[in-house]
Swiss-Prot record:
Official protein name in the record: Small ribosomal subunit protein uS4c
Primary role: One of the primary rRNA binding proteins, it binds directly to 16S rRNA where it nucleates assembly of the body of the 30S subunit. With S5 and S12 plays an important role in translational accuracy.
Taxonomic lineage of the native organism: Eukaryota, Viridiplantae, Streptophyta, Embryophyta, Marchantiophyta
Organism: Ricciocarpos natans
Keywords: Chloroplast, Plastid, Ribonucleoprotein, Ribosomal protein, RNA-binding, rRNA-binding
Location of the protein in the cell: Plastid, Chloroplast
Subunit structure: Part of the 30S ribosomal subunit. Contacts protein S5. The interaction surface between S4 and S5 is involved in control of translational fidelity.
C-alpha cells in the first residue's frame, strides 16, 4: 500500500488530530454527532485498525514500512509498543518536524529529499534515517535552504520541543540528546493495540 496523498481533513475527521499529517484542526458544531460511529457497536478489530491507521498517517508511512518497524520492535528488548514509537520518533523526518523546522512530517520529508538537511555536516537525503544521540542537525549553507527553513520557523506555531532534543534558533541547529521518553510522544495513541493488530503478521 502506497503512502497516503489524499485529503488530510478527511483523515483527521475520522481518526482525530494527527499533528504530523496536518496542522489543521476540526471544529465540530454544537451537538455534532459522528454518524459513522453513533448507534453502532464498534468491534475490537476496528478499534485496533484505527489505532494502526493513526500511527501510519501521523508518521506518513506505507503499510509495508510500518509492518517492518513492528517486526524490528518485536525483536528488541523492552515493551514492543514503546520501542515501536521510539523507532518512529527517531526517524529524521520526524526529528525535523519536532524541532519546528517543518510544519508537518510530509513537509520535513520534502526537506530531506531535496537535500537541504545535514547530519554531522554530511548531507542525508533519506527521511527514514535513524537519528542517534549526539547527532547534530543543521541546514545546508545555501540561500534556498536557509530561506525555506527560516520561513518555516517564522510562519508556523511551535510545539514544545521534547526533552530528547535541543534546538539553537540563532544557529538553526538541532541536537539529539537521547532516545525519546514515552511521555514526550504527544500523539494520542494506544500503541499496544497497534502491536495486537499486527500480532498475526509478524
Amino acid at each position: 500500500m502506497s503512502r497516503y496523498r489524499g485529503p488530510r481533513v478527511k483523515i483527521i475527521r475520522r481518526l482525530g488530530a494527527l499533528p504530523g499529517l496536518t496542522n489543521k484542526t476540526l471544529k465540530s458544531k454544537p451537538g455534532y454527532i459522528n454518524q459513522s460511529t453513533s448507534n453502532k457497536k464498534v468491534s475490537q478489530y476496528r478499534i485496533r485498525l484505527e489505532e494502526k491507521q493513526k500511527l501510519r498517517f501521523h508518521y506518513g508511512l506505507t503499510e509495508r514500512q510500518l509492518l517492518k518497524y513492528v517486526r524490528i520492535a518485536r525483536k528488541a528488548k523492552g515493551s514492543t509498543g514503546q520501542v515501536l514509537l521510539q523507532l518512529l520518533e527517531m526517524r529524521l523526518d520526524n526529528i525535523i518536524f519536532r524541532l519546528g523546522m517543518a510544519p508537518t512530517i510530509p513537509g520535513a520529508r520534502q526537506l530531506v529529499n531535496h537535500r537541504h538537511i545535514l547530519i554531522n555536516n554530511s548531507t542525508v537525503d533519506i527521511p527514514s534515517y535513524n537519528c542517534k544521540p549526539k547527532d547534530v542537525i543543521t541546514i545546508k549553507d545555501r540561500p534556498k535552504s536557509q530561506s525555506i527553513i527560516t520561513k518555516n520557523l517564522n510562519s508556523f506555531q511551535k510545539q514544545k520541543i521534547p526533552n530528547h532534543l535541543t534546538f539553537d534558533l540563532m544557529q538553526v541547529k538541532g541536537l539529539v540528546n537521547q532516545i525519546i521518553d514515552r511521555e514526550w510522544i504527544f500523539l494520542k495513541i494506544n500503541e499496544l493495540l497497534v502491536v495486537e493488530y499486527y500480532s498475526r503478521q509478524v
